[in-house]
Amino acid sequence: MPSHASQPATSRPITNVLTNPPQLPLIAPSILAADYTKLGEECRSAIEAGGDLLHFDVMDGHLVPNLALGVDMLASLKAAMPDAFFDAHLMIERPDVFAEPFAQAGAEHLTFHIEAMNGEMAGDRGRALIDTIRGLGMSAGIAIDGPTAIEKADALLEHADLVLIMAIRAGFSGQAFAPAALDKIRYVRERVSETTRIEVDGGVGPANAADLLQAGADVLAAASAVFRVSPPERVSVITQMRGSASGS
């Protein structure tokens, strides 16, 4: 079997909030759980409460059993909030087709699922997509769904700027956190550099933030924990999650 390490992604890493963070951990409010009737207001509230970036879930109804958000939605939010950092998480079968549209819409980071990279050439296709994403001016991440064995990501771990570990089965917000994600975080942290971000998505909140950070995560994508409380309470939620890094 040929070595994946002999065929690295050739593009230069992008410098942004994720790859060169002003602080760790980073808190990424996930707008999937926001009130869509006032989405702009919700996003501003999350940033004003201390969120570092906005996690933007995209679903096509094929890779995952739900539909959510899209290019035009991100473009509208970016136009209204030009200083906000958008972390686009593409839970779709053809991330290669949508990399450029999301870059043009204003995404600063794009994560695609390894489950979308099928076949014998999955590693090569994944590395090529990482190059494409960086060539468009975005940092590049890979995501692993909850039921997927973490070893399936081995061919791409060393090439991505970020590894996103789903602590649920991708598709719906509000699911319970699966503790097996902690072992996946440890597995990845042992195999990537200190500058590679590890993001966790699904059931994330103050109750498990300390465990996630201790395992090696440094980006927490929180949906219901942030958006299912009132705006004044969001400051406390984000502060608690960030404070978990020091045990406070």
Regions found by a protein language model. Give the residues of each.
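N-terminal amphipathic alpha-helix/helix-capping segment at the start of soluble metabolic enzymes
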Residues: 2-33, 40-41
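Hydrophobic faces of well-ordered beta-strands that scaffold small-molecule active sites
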Residues: 26-30, 54-56, 77, 86-90, ...
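Active-site beta-loop-alpha junctions enriched in small/polar residues
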Residues: 30-34, 59-61, 91-93, 115-117, ...
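Conserved anion-binding
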Residues: 38, 83, 97-101, 107-197
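Conserved, mostly hydrophobic/aromatic
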Residues: 39, 46, 57, 102, ...
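A structural motif
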Residues: 48-51, 107, 160, 217
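Glycine-rich, proline-tolerant flexible connector loops at the mouths of alpha/beta enzymes
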Residues: 54-71, 114-121, 168-176, 230
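C-terminal helical cap(s) of enzyme catalytic domains, especially alpha/beta-barrels
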Residues: 213, 227-248
